[in-house]
């Protein structure tokens, strides 16, 4: 029963509570219950994203938000036909991975990043199949501030090596490739190396995201409106940044999660994970574990850090439900 004091408080302050200003992000998920891949799953997920635009932040510039994106399954037919135009025949679905990569606009830095990625692929015994420029709508209205930060968007296609038999092993190799390439690129201390980022690298899923408004994601990324873009799942997120500034890499979804909330123990969690790096061991990752450090970075958002840790545990063999 509502007390007299509570009624008086409501009369004076209304239903608004400043305590709720900590987890305003919007997220949604749609899936075919039988796992059937269809294009309308993608369009329905994008519609959900449009319908939760009120959960994301918009600046004084109405074309600048905190970021939005979608995670879907690999659209094999789309990628297969597009890569065939370059003379590249992709292996069977599940036998190759796709890395979605944000690259610097500055040519020399971009070339250095691509070369380090190719070196990492070769070093891990996997096969570089080719690169693809991600088609985007350059005519879409975009905030000048967002346009200034807009990366070059490319996909790298990676075939499994002879030592990789099952898809889980390929996922682990892609994980190691992504981590080692990123570490090597940052070690170069390029002027624009901070503009390099890998939203996803997997044989199962791909992430399309950016410093976009909710209704811009499906317009900006032309792949998403292509009828060949089919998936049985669609995970979408519209960001309301609370503890980090809006940036292209910090948009959700991440590789494993999309999150509505704020993890206030993020610094402690990061430090604990950093401390554990010296004593961790994994029979699944074996010697590759040493190539993955650091697991996370101090200048990321709370969700990015959580995603890094969840990814490590999953790659080490823990069920995601555990």
PLM region spans:
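Conserved short alpha-helical segments that host acidic/polar catalytic motifs at enzyme active sites
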Residues: 1-322
